[in-house]
């Protein structure tokens, strides 16, 4: 992680560090371009997507490849794949990869609502029979990537290892450009795991794209059954889940959100519950296809073998991305623990509400949670 690196005094200025940013939203520009009087010399450099990556390279004097990637919802995972390729080819020695999504203009909400993409009930119900769309959310996340041998030699904290990654396209879809394709998704999975030399049936967990749409979820499930889960024994189904049920759909940054969840699953050897899964989608053969949605906290166990997890991410223009992760080397664990910051016990618990009465009621609920043994740090982080 970049914050760990900089906290340890790392300085990458002048280095061959690449920057790869998944970004697509033009909301800020849309808000400001209606009035010609507000356009100034900074309007171009402040609103073009290329600057999202280029400005990071400029501010920190990073000399490697610098590019912004727009493949809609798969942008950040495609950006990570490009970063991996740059490291493998030697174009970069180190790489920052991630994505960002901000919701600042009603355009996307109106358009996606008219396309029946957004949930009228405000819930991402991935793989559930009542799934009726997704909830837009915003955020950003980045990871610092290095070749494994160099990271070990430098004594860096290694959170996980990227064993393989890949990107492809649905191509022409009879249902329209925004309709996913199970055949293309399955083809991508086969190629990624073949190149990585990993049996997909050995996956401990797969973080699905899982938006909770009536069309997308069954299509993704068919691809998973075809390649990853269909040949498993009945007592060892593939565990799947979607972080979108917990934090909403970060769109261009959603692949990175899924990747970070997958990394934490490896580190803790457990998977948190995917929310709002009550009735399995009847369009998915969960039992016959050996799929199980993680509807409660579950431990992961691969026996003596390292845990392996996968991450799916798809764009509504047809660009698919997949990444497979394995656990960090055991030798790294004892020597690379990051010390807890001195201020860790001083994190503020920030509350906000629509009125003073609502704020008081909210504060009361947090007090009750603390009285019942709730962890202050966890509550402060989630508030």
Regions found by a protein language model. Name each.
Residues 1-343, 347-348, 353, 357, ...:
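Condensing-enzyme catalytic core of the thiolase-fold
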Residues 365-369:
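Conserved short hydrophobic interaction patches
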